[in-house]
Amino acid sequence: MHHTKTKADIGLTKVIADLTLKGYVPCIPLSEHQPYDLVAIDGHGHALKLQVKYAGLKRNGIVEVSFRRNWSDRNGTHTVHYSRDEFDYYAIYCPEKDTTLYVKNSPDCPKAIRFTETGNHQSQNVKWFRDYLKLNGSPQRLYAAHLKR
């Protein structure tokens, strides 16, 4: 699959499903001109803004994420890096693992997140996927009773 908009749509729907299963209420902004793709509200009413990314698994077992936005218009192709105040988290969907990773929007965002062991079995300074499966703790399970039916 190569169409960028289709990948973005798949990523967004997978993140919405993941957030719902984790007890968040996902909300989509009315305007596509916001620097974030959706808002996640936890069981306490706290809202987090998320920028969704679709990132495929590389052969070496990592997901690389580009923390910038790209667009094209009649003046050419443009690239702009996100700023810290635009949203709270990146929600990165990896289709090969059918997994969503949540990375805090900060200056020290990992550029690569690893799913498989390194070739040299190094573990120091490796950013493992399992450390990015939760979004800011665990909210109350808003839909837990509904899901058990």
Where are these regions (language model features)?
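Mixed-charge (Asp/Glu-Lys/Arg
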Residues: 1-34, 39-149
